Amino acid sequence: MIAKQRDRRRGRITAALVALSSLAALISGTQQAVAEVKHIEIADKGKIFKSEPASGFVLHPREIPGVDEGQTARSVIEGAEAKGVVTRVSPLSVAQSKQHIGRPLCHTTGINGTFKYNGFCWDETDDKTSAWSNGWHPQGFTASHDADASGTVDGHHLYMATWYYGVKGSDRNKKARISILESTGTERTYGHVLLVRPGGSRTDPQFTSVDDVHADGMVWYGNRLFVANGGELQIYDLNHLWKVNSISEKSGIVGGTSSAEYHQWALPMVARYSNRTKAQQDTAKPEKQSNMFCDGAIACLSALSLDRSTSPPRLVSGRYGDAEREAEVDVIRWPIEYLGEGGTSPVSATAAYKAPVHGLQGVATDGTYYYISAMCDTDYMKVAEPSDPAAYYCIWQAVPDGPVSILTRTPPLTQNLSYSFSSGRLWGMNETNGMRVVFSLLPRKADNSQYLYNDYSKLCSGVGSTVENSKPVIQWRCNGSEDELWVFEETKDNNGNPAYFIQNRYSGKCLGTGSSLANGKGMIQYTCNSKVDEKWWYDQDTHELRNVYSGKCLGLGSAATKGSQLIQWTCNGAQDERWIISRTAPKV
């Protein structure tokens, strides 16, 4: 949310972040003038993701402004369709319109290669557009894996993102759109849909673009689309996705003509909930009357995802917290079955947690772990200033009432997350203009990582907390650090015999010989590329690791000291060629 760059919620962002930093935020291809970032020390690793009482978090059913008394949003929508001024279409048809053509992954992500990440980019225009300069910023993310347990809708993999529009500076949150994209694996096509609010009556239907909106998060479930907006939850019905019959700057219906501010499609709201009653909102101070307002004392929906591990599923929301905040931020679970059209009773949360992280932007769960996009700890993988909007973000993980830990770095200002129960992949996207990507990864891929312990030196193999290609793989005192853990991924040699890629848990790089055949050649880490010099045979009886390319054994030579580089040598049965692979750190 450009570090939730919004003028709207006092305390939601610090002056240090509003003033930005040396952000490589491109606006129309030029670099934005920014100020120096204030140094803030962040050290959240090990803090507890703890349960808290949920009864105080409530969503109240609210009216949709502009609908005539005695009418409903549904009746207005049906009236517009009956007049023939709009045409109902499917999400798939929007995606397949090819209004925009996405690109393969085009920017550096910072994601650890261990987690087998992939993804795509928007087209160049949507990559660079900015809500700070007459354009758009992306926020929420959902997909067909949320909509249907099969992972597809009408047999297709579809993805959606919310965007909010701004004119310049603080004049943002003017309107919102969603993008509907289909990915076939080789082609990514999408279209933009304006979010609109119905008004008037069945006999005199009208609509206008939704304003006062940041569109923080989004969940697609069945035919319903839930859009989080800070202090508000908006609901849309995708069975009433409209194609308008004219393209102009106007929004609404005039005679027999419908238009949606230069959009081909519009999606009307059918219901809304708020963290306050109408009386509470109307009597609030002027600066707190926005639909987006939340201050932490009440439910704050700054992120939204779907948990399909329960039946029925649960909505999961998260509250944003800036770099300087001290208190934890709320992660709340909501009963989706009670949130819909025609609601007359408040809906209470079913569970809640305190997330001890800075800059929460997204949250999702696989039913066991919660995944949170937030600022990295200071100096994690050389992230010196986590509050710098140009800095990598991190995905954190935790089980309820357990400590938080970093899973991986992610692109700067990573926003909402979405977990696919059909594929086991965690999806996300970031908002930094000129650096935007949509990505997915396998978050549990490193769960079976193991220590590689030398029988001669009694030391563990590691990478010295480096992430760069060609850095030496060394031995060090076994201390349980992440860079001493290795993922042994099964593969085959050229003859179909079992072999392994050995991938470092910390760097995500593979252990290899640098395509060398020489005795004494030092082992290095390198981006895994499936080359034969990254493949290893392991003999369970002799405990030898033999490189498939060179045929040489992994060893130490005569070196038994901390920091010495691992080498390859003609296999000779020496003790320094014996390696113990263990799930637990050796005790020495």
Please name every model-derived segment.
Residues 146, 314-402:
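Loop/turn-rich, solvent-exposed surfaces of beta-rich toroidal or solenoidal domains
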